[in-house]
Amino acid sequence: MSSGSAEAELSTLQSQIEELTERIVAVADRYRDTPDSAITTELDGAERNLLTARRAVERAQRNLP
């Protein structure tokens, strides 16, 4: 795989991760301060994991030749 196509693929993945993060936060916010706040706790964990994944993709992009 050429570095150009790898960069494009990683950029697409980064965009998808950002979109998923926004969607997770939107759902979590609907359950915040409700009796179902345990749902928010789980989704906040998912958000943190997605942020970690986004940073990993960014590091991979920086390491491309």
Language-model features: locations:
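N-terminal acidic leader/helix
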Residues: 1-28, 58
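Short, charge-rich amphipathic interface segments used for partner binding and complex assembly
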Residues: 26-63
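Short, solvent-exposed, charged loop/turn and helix-capping segments
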Residues: 2, 63-64
